[in-house]
Regions:
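C-terminal beta-strand-loop-alpha-helix "lid" module of Rossmann-like NAD(P)-dependent dehydrogenases
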Residues: 1-267
Length: 267
């Protein structure tokens, strides 16, 4: 009986340590959420502004032959895969890699330590990924697309729906899809629309990469906080159950000792 109570006491101590760890990680994630979601919203707004510029010129005759809106001759696809830098974020990383399996013939470009580990390639950290990193990638991708090295450029990332809901998604970057409601601008562009498109498309690919990295990081932080909240609740429930079991075992041991004492005194 004594050994049983000792085992229960050790288990309670172990689970309690886990509870402290999950609470600490949850607090760290909570402290990052506002900054991460603010960065996500700003990157969304900037991307929309760049897309508006492209949509305003892309329907012009000068842009009809642009390689960026033509279907590539190559059937090869290059896909950026954005995952987290760390684990303990629920199904965040697993959902990304599950979606990536749907493109077995693609060449993957990882962003985020876990993505680099998965594809066994060097990868920048998602949390510190910025504009300079994105524009370097964008220029490299555009050159490859223009040369016909691949016909599709895409990105696998996570969409932020709410604090409780994040969804893995695939977005095609190139060829650029002209929106159905896109209208030719009444503005006169100098020197012409084709030159504007050439400049804007680099900014588009750059800002789309930045937006998806920022949004994915916000999802990672939210998923980690949710996972830590859930783990914390499970740990608290386990501690309650173990404490109840411990008290019962201890009470049983005391009762047994009293019974033995009474029996001994009667003899």
């Amino acid at each position: 009986m004594a050994s049983n109570t000792k085992q229960l006491r050790n288990r309670i101590k172990s689970v309690n340590s886990t509870l402290h760890l999950t609470k600490a990680m949850g607090l760290v994630a909570s402290s990052k959420i506002k900054k991460a979601t603010d960065a996500m919203l700003k990157s969304r707004q900037y991307l929309e502004a760049v897309e508006d510029v492209i949509d305003s010129v892309i329907s012009s005759p000068e842009c009809k032959k642009s390689p960026y809106i033509q279907e590539g001759k190559s059937k090869k696809a290059k896909i950026i895969v954005i995952a987290g830098d760390r684990g303990l974020a629920g199904g965040y990383n697993a959902n990304i890699f599950r979606l990536a399996k749907e493109y077995p013939d693609a060449e993957f470009i990882p962003i985020g330590k876990r993505s680099g580990d998965r594809f066994e390639k060097d990868a920048p950290y998602a949390e510190g990924f910025g504009y300079e990193d994105a524009i370097t990638l964008a220029k490299e991708f555009l050159q490859g697309f223009e040369k016909g090295e691949y016909g599709t450029l895409g990105i696998i990332s996570t969409k932020y729906v709410s604090m409780l809901t994040q969804e893995a998604q695939y977005t095609e970057i190139l060829p650029y899809k002209v929106k159905e409601n896109a209208k030719k601008a009444s503005t006169v562009f100098e020197p012409n629309e084709a030159v504007i498109l050439e400049s804007a498309i680099t900014e588009y690919v750059t800002s789309l990469i930045v937006k998806n990295v920022k949004e994915s990081f916000a999802c990672e932080v939210a998923a980690r906080r949710n996972a830590m909240d859930s783990a914390g609740k499970n740990a608290e429930e386990m501690i309650d159950n173990l404490s109840l079991e411990y008290n019962r075992a201890r009470q049983g041991a005391i009762t047994q000792e009293l019974t033995e004492i009474v029996a001994g005194s009667g003899a």
